């Protein structure tokens, strides 16, 4: 961009895709987006779930459109499943039987994990017993298809990783500095419109199962608005959830990406010259 090349910022954050979550997802402001096209920010209504496959299909279209007009698409975000689906493709898992899905999601988490340990022990060993989303997904696939999720994941198709020139960069800030920023961010959101954002979501009476209703900050603020949590308790809970997510992202970025992807560790500032050298610009 400094050299005058047109660019397009493509969102790769699973919360920033929702129009309903401008504040709680820390979506870039109009001022921050001025002058450079930003796409897939606030592109989905909260009533419609944006799956990794949905996002990857939209991202492929935006990347192709950018290339067609000679612009550089820059993916920004830390949702690992989105990025891996775009690059590697998607597993052709058959449609899950709705009754199976309903039964699995109605199970106590402990019971679901115990069943997964018996039916797909390899997958169960890789998951934390509290990882409700991944446990229920693995179990519903096993029940509905008769095969473990790993079987389907070995048959990925549709990825663009081999068709584009990648210049990846992983930013790894000092962990305690990052956690302090997480805590501060949630407090600023609380006073900067997050309450009104959640009130508007609750007024829509959307199902709790939708991703927009499970986004960090929404359950905590909803509990405060219902009178189930005090202000301080809701803020502390939201801060803890944010730190937990940052920790999971940190682990994923360190261990799940190709080893040759450059990583930049820093304390509280970013050296743009070093970034340029890492990206081989």
Curated annotation (Swiss-Prot):
It comes from the Bacteria. Pfam families: IPPT. Its cofactor is Mg(2+). The record marks 79, 101 as: Interaction with substrate tRNA. Monomer. Catalyzes the transfer of a dimethylallyl group onto the adenine at position 37 in tRNAs that read codons beginning with uridine, leading to the formation of N6-(dimethylallyl)adenosine (i(6)A). This is tRNA dimethylallyltransferase. It comes from Novosphingobium aromaticivorans (strain ATCC 700278 / DSM 12444 / CCUG 56034 / CIP 105152 / NBRC 16084 / F199). The gene is miaA.
